[in-house]
Regions:
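Conserved alpha/beta-hydrolase "acid-adjacent" motif
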Residues: 264-270
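Catalytic histidine neighborhood in serine/cysteine hydrolases
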Residues: 276-293
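Catalytic histidine-centered segment of alpha/beta-hydrolase-like enzymes
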Residues: 290-302
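Alpha/beta-hydrolase
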Residues: 148, 152-246
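Conserved acidic catalytic loop of the alpha/beta-hydrolase fold
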Residues: 89-107
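Short beta-strand/loop motif that positions the catalytic acidic residue
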Residues: 257-259
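Conserved HGGG/HGGXW glycine-rich cap/lid loop of the alpha/beta-hydrolase fold
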Residues: 20-76, 81
Length: 324
C-alpha cells in the first residue's frame, strides 16, 4: 500500500512531568482510534514521517519527544539531573502521564527500534491501556543485546569498530558503552564532541546493511550530542530491564513485529524470541532484503496498522474530551 499523504499536527503542547517538559503533538481525526507513536534512539526525537503510516480519518495520532530528546526540555546532554531519570520506569510513567493528559482510555502503540522496546515495556506495565502493538526493528536494552550491538557486531564491521574502540581507551573488563558514557559526561566539551562524533559514526555503520541511509541529523552537533548521550546512558544503565519475562501479561493483545533479515545490529532472533514468548496473537513479519529499517518495513507497518483497525478489535475509547 502507499503511505498516506503528509499531514500537519492539529495540536501541540508541552506537558510538565517530574524533572522534564515533554513536547507532544496530535494529528489525524480527533475522534478516531487513539494511536501512540514511539520514536527510537533513545534520543532520536520526532520527525514527521510517522504520521503517514496511519489513516488520518481513522486514527487520532499522538506522538511525543521522549524525555531528554527533540523539543522536550531539558536536553539530556545539558542536564545530568535529567539524564539520571532516564530509565524504563520513568519513560513508562511519561507515557502514562501523556495518556491521562490527552484523555485517552487506551491506544494502539507503534514503536520503532528502541521505541518498540519501550512500547512493550509500557504494554506489560499497563496492559488494560493498550489496544495492540505494531513494532518495527525491535531492539532491546538487555545487556547481551547491547554488548552485541556495541562490540560483537564489530566482527562484521571491523574497520568502523576499531575506530570506535580506539577512541575510547578503557581498562580490561570495562564495557565499551560504559567508556563512552564517561566520555560523554566529561567536563571538557571537546572530549564530549569527539565521543559523540565517534559514536554516531558507529551507529551509521552498523545499521547500513539493507540500503538504510544515514540520519542527516547526525551532522548537527546538538543532535548528535543528545543522541549519543542518551543512547550510551540508557544502554549502560538498563541492563536486563527489558520485560521479556512479563510478556504473558500481554499475550491477549494483537501484535505485529516487522523486522529486517539483514538487521545485524538487532538480529531477527530478538523479535523471534519475543513472538514465541508472546504467543499466537503476536505475528512476526520478516522483510528479507532490508536491515534496521527501510521502505518495505515501513509499508508493512502501515499495512499492519490498517489491518488491526479493520478487525474492529480497536475501538476509540475516550475518558475525556476529544481535543486537543
Amino acid at each position: 500500500m502507499s503511505l498516506f499523504p503528509p499531514i500537519e499536527p492539529h495540536a501541540t503542547g508541552m506537558l510538565g512531568v517530574p524533572g522534564a517538559e515533554l513536547f507532544w503533538e496530535t494529528s489525524g481525526n480527533p475522534r478516531g482510534i487513539p494511536a501512540l507513536y514511539l520514536h527510537g534512539g533513545p534520543g532520536a526525537g520526532l520527525l514527521s514521517g510517522h504520521r503517514r503510516r496511519f489513516c488520518p480519518e481513522t486514527f487520532r495520532i499522538v506522538a511525543f519527544d521522549q524525555r531528554g530528546a527533540g523539543r522536550s526540555l531539558p536536553r539530556a546532554d545539558e542536564s545530568a539531573e535529567l539524564l539520571a531519570t532516564c530509565d524504563f520506569r520513568t519513560f513508562v510513567r511519561d507515557i502514562e502521564a501523556l495518556r491521562v493528559h490527552l484523555g485517552v482510555d487506551a491506544w494502539l502503540l507503534h514503536g520503532v527500534s528502541f521505541g518498540a522496546s519501550l512500547a512493550l515495556a509500557y504494554a506489560t506495565s499497563h496492559p488494560h491501556r493498550v489496544l495492540g502493538v505494531v513494532g518495527m526493528a525491535l531492539s532491546t536494552t538487555r545487556a547481551s543485546d547491547v554488548d552485541w550491538m556495541t562490540e560483537g557486531v564489530g566482527k562484521l564491521f571491523p574497520e568502523a569498530w576499531a575506530e570506535l574502540s580506539e577512541a575510547a581507551p578503557r581498562p580490561p573488563g570495562t564495557r565499551l558503552v560504559e567508556a563512552y558514557r564517561a566520555l560523554l559526561a566529561s567536563p571538557d566539551p571537546n572530549v564530549r564532541e569527539r565521543a559523540a562524533r565517534s559514536w554516531v559514526a558507529w551507529e551509521e555503520a552498523h545499521v547500513s546493511l539493507g540500503g538504510k541511509g544515514g540520519d542527516p541529523r547526525f551532522a548537527d552537533p546538538r543532535f548528535r550530542a543528545t543522541f549519543a548521550t542518551l543512547v550510551c546512558h540508557v544502554f549502560a544503565e538498563l541492563g536486563e530491564a527489558f520485560p521479556m519475562g512479563d510478556l504473558a501479561r500481554v499475550s491477549h493483545l494483537p501484535t505485529v513485529l516487522v523486522h529486517g533479515r539483514l538487521d545485524v545490529s538487532s538480529p531477527v532472533g530478538v523479535p523471534f524470541e519475543v513472538a514465541r514468548r508472546w504467543g499466537p496473537r503476536c505475528e512476526l513479519q520478516v522483510v528479507e532484503d532490508e536491515g534496521h529499517g527501510g521502505p518495505k518495513m515501513v509499508d508493512a507497518c502501515a499495512r499492519a496498522i490498517a489491518r488491526l483497525a479493520s478487525t474492529h478489535l480497536l475501538e476509540p475509547r475516550l475518558t475525556g474530551p476529544a481535543s486537543p
